A protein has these predicted regions:
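Conserved NTP-binding/hydrolysis core of motor NTPases
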Residues: 85, 94-271
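Glycine- and acidic
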Residues: 54-58, 66-82, 103-113, 163-165, ...
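Conserved active-site and cofactor/substrate-binding residues in soluble primary-metabolism enzymes
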Residues: 67, 86-87, 300
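N-terminal pre-P-loop "Q-motif" helix
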Residues: 81-91
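Generic alpha-helical secondary structure signal
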Residues: 67-74, 82, 173-177, 242, ...
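Extended, charged/polar low-complexity intrinsically disordered regions
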Residues: 1-77
């Protein structure tokens, strides 16, 4: 009698260390960027696993040849300037979080701050859709328990979790000093184990986090060094013009299948992106120090998201310097 195959159940989206693949419900990508489809029952027989997730995923793709990545980047820059380039770069770098933590024992947070009407949410929704996810992230609210919020963070590995509307202060279930440990790949939340000894259990924080808010909530200098901040402008501040409105309508008109196709092409490029990102980081940190960035941690955090900007039409040496000195144009 033939034995039934042993299938492992994975309850997280994103990177799966055991298989080395990225899982998005009923699709997966291997290290070479090859797309793998589950069978009609959701099993990846070649990988010996099943990805169990209640999250909504965009599975349909347009013709990949119909997507010109550079044109998409130009559209984003027309709306947001270099902010869009840095934001997309952070989402790409987060796919490699496990590599950053292994090599450097640290991975930064992203902050997207600016007044209502500056387009932050539109950009975040677009980037979530690029990586196949039909969600907007987690809302900052005190009503959620620590355990519930911790579990929501746990269910994504090497994907960005938008943390929305922490305007001026973080909720009680996400204390600011918890970010210090999470920066180094630790847990955001710990609890006592149900045992007689001193054992503590903590859900690992393997995702990236983008804080999306009107006012930044950070007060601790040590936390601020671990956050890359992008400042967005609304119409009153000159950030929204007739030209950007036209481009925004074009962006909003892109179907989720089109956005997912952009992600598909990026996943196909991931091995090359990985090689270039890590090859360029050291030189970028040297450039930042030469331009007055004295903190090694600040130089590192900014080099993470600036390691693959050339193909996005962003001068690779100028952009991180502009960002780290506070000019987000």
């Amino acid at each position: 009698k033939q034995k039934a195959p042993v299938v492992r159940l994975v309850d997280r989206l994103g990177y799966d260390p055991q298989s080395g693949c990225y899982l998005f419900g009923k699709i997966a990508y291997d290290q070479k960027g090859q797309r793998i489809a589950a069978n009609d029952k959701g099993f990846f027989l070649g990988l010996g696993l099943r990805c169990s997730s209640s999250e909504l995923i965009e599975y349909n793709l347009d013709n990949p040849d119909s997507i010109d990545l550079k044109s998409i980047i130009q559209l984003l820059r027309k709306i947001y300037g270099n902010r869009a380039v840095f934001a997309m770069s952070y989402f790409i770098a987060t796919l490699l979080k496990q590599e950053f933590v292994k090599k450097h024992s640290a991975f930064p947070f992203l902050s997207m701050a600016g007044p209502k009407g500056s387009g932050k949410t539109t950009l975040v929704d677009f980037l979530n859709n690029v990586f196949f996810q039909l969600w907007q992230g987690i809302a900052a609210k005190d009503a959620s328990t620590d355990k519930a919020v911790g579990r929501r963070f746990y269910h994504r590995h090497s994907l960005v979790i938008p943390f929305n509307e922490a305007n001026g202060s973080l909720p009680k279930n996400l204390p600011e000093n918890a970010l210090l440990d999470a920066f180094h790949g630790g847990s955001l939340y710990d609890r006592a184990a149900k045992s007689q000894d001193a054992e503590v259990i903590g859900l690992p924080f393997d995702a990236g986090m983008a804080f999306v808010q009107n006012l930044e909530p950070f007060t601790m200098p040590a936390v601020k060094e671990r956050v890359v901040t992008l400042r967005f402008l609304n119409a009153e501040e000159g950030g929204v013009t007739d030209e950007t409105r036209t481009a925004m309508r074009e962006l909003e008109g892109l179907a989720t299948s089109t956005r997912a196709t952009i992600g598909h092409k990026l996943m196909e490029m991931l091995s090359a992106l990985k090689r270039d990102i890590f090859a360029e980081m050291s030189g970028l940190q040297d450039d930042l120090r030469e331009h007055g960035v004295l903190s090694p941690r600040v130089a590192y955090t900014h080099s993470v998201i600036a390691g693959k900007l050339g193909w996005m039409g962003c001068p690779i040496r100028r952009c991180p310097i502009t960002l780290a000195t506070g000019l987000n144009g």
